[in-house]
């Protein structure tokens, strides 16, 4: 019985992962021009809530919510949901400079527009670092100039590559661009800043993080004064009595 329950949970997890991957691929194509940055699925017994994260939420919603209703209808038909069992919401990305997906899409549109690779990458690098990131790494690979494919890496700031903090501090995204000379691959990695509030970065500090506490200002006395301390009284210890020898 327990084995059947485990298999059922495993199948349910696989189905949920496939649904999220297909939904992400669908929304990536539909909302590419609207700053699509990711999707979050919250499933309840009654219905499923799909939260679309984008930089331009007004374009996602459309005039009087028309576009979000059309997307809801398409998702219901494409993924076999019953009518009224799925709801789509749009959430604005608070700081798009720290969103790897948004910056990857921004770099993709710059390359499609004909901007030079080096200039486009340095522009994205500068914008991410000005947004408060600890570090950034941009890799562009493919036929960039000649017929031979190569990769160009642009790095700035601090970047960690191993350990458990990678799961909390590193955001990465991969996109592909179809240009005239061939397909160009783009990879953007951003190291988020430490934020105790949890808004722009993780709340957990790095293991090697050292916080220096500012010393308190010493309050100087305005007038001369003296302190009288009570003197400790000497406690007299009774002298040891001689012990009579044992005969």
UniProtKB/Swiss-Prot annotation:
MF terms from GO for this chain are: RNA binding; structural constituent of ribosome
Cross-referenced InterPro entries:
KH_dom-like_a/b, KH_dom_type_2, KH_sf_prok-type, Ribosomal_S3_C_sf, Ribosomal_uS3_C, Ribosomal_uS3_CS, Ribosomal_uS3_euk/arc
User: Which residues lie in Low complexity bias regions?
Assistant: 236-247
Keywords of the record, alphabetical order, are: Ribonucleoprotein, Ribosomal protein, RNA-binding
CDD domains, A to Z? KH-II_40S_S3
For this entry, list what GO says about its biological process: positive regulation of apoptotic signaling pathway; translation
Sequence ranges assigned to domain KH type-2 in this UniProt record: 23-94
Q: Which GO terms describe its cellular component?
A: cytosolic small ribosomal subunit; nucleus
List the biased-composition ranges (Basic and acidic residues). 219-235
Q: Where is this region: Disordered?
A: 216-247
Question: Which NCBIfam families has this protein been placed in?
Answer: PRK04191.1 (NF003219), uS3_euk_arch (TIGR01008)
Family assignment from sequence similarity: Belongs to the universal ribosomal protein uS3 family.
What this protein is called in its record is Small ribosomal subunit protein uS3
The major lineage groups are: Eukaryota, Metazoa, Ecdysozoa, Nematoda, Chromadorea
Q: Which gene encodes it?
A: rps-3
């Amino acid at each position: 019985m327990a084995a059947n329950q485990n298999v059922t949970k495993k199948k349910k997890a696989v189905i949920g992962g496939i649904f999220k991957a297909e939904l992400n691929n669908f929304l990536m194509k539909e909302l590419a021009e609207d700053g699509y940055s990711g999707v979050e699925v919250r499933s309840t017994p009654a219905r499923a809530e799909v939260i679309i994260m984008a930089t331009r939420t007004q374009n996602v919603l459309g005039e009087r919510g028309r576009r979000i209703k059309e997307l809801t209808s398409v998702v219901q038909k494409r993924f076999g949901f019953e009518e009224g069992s799925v709801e789509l919401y749009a959430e604005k990305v608070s700081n798009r400079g720290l969103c790897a997906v948004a910056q990857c899409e921004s770099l993709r549109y710059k390359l499609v527009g004909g901007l030079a690779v080096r200039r486009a990458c340095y522009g994205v690098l500068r914008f991410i670092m000005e947004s408060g990131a600890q570090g950034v790494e941009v890799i562009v690979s493919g036929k960039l100039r000649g017929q031979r494919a190569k990769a160009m890496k642009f790095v700035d700031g601090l970047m960690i590559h191993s350990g458990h903090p990678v799961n909390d501090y590193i955001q990465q995204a991969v996109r592909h661009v179809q240009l005239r000379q061939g397909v160009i691959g783009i990879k953007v990695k951003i190291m988020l800043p430490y934020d105790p509030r949890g808004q722009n970065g993780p709340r957990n500090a790095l293991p090697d993080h050292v916080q220096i506490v500012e010393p308190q200002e010493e309050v100087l006395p305005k007038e001369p004064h003296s302190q009288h301390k009570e003197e400790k009284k000497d406690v007299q210890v009774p002298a040891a009595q001689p012990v009579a020898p044992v005969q």
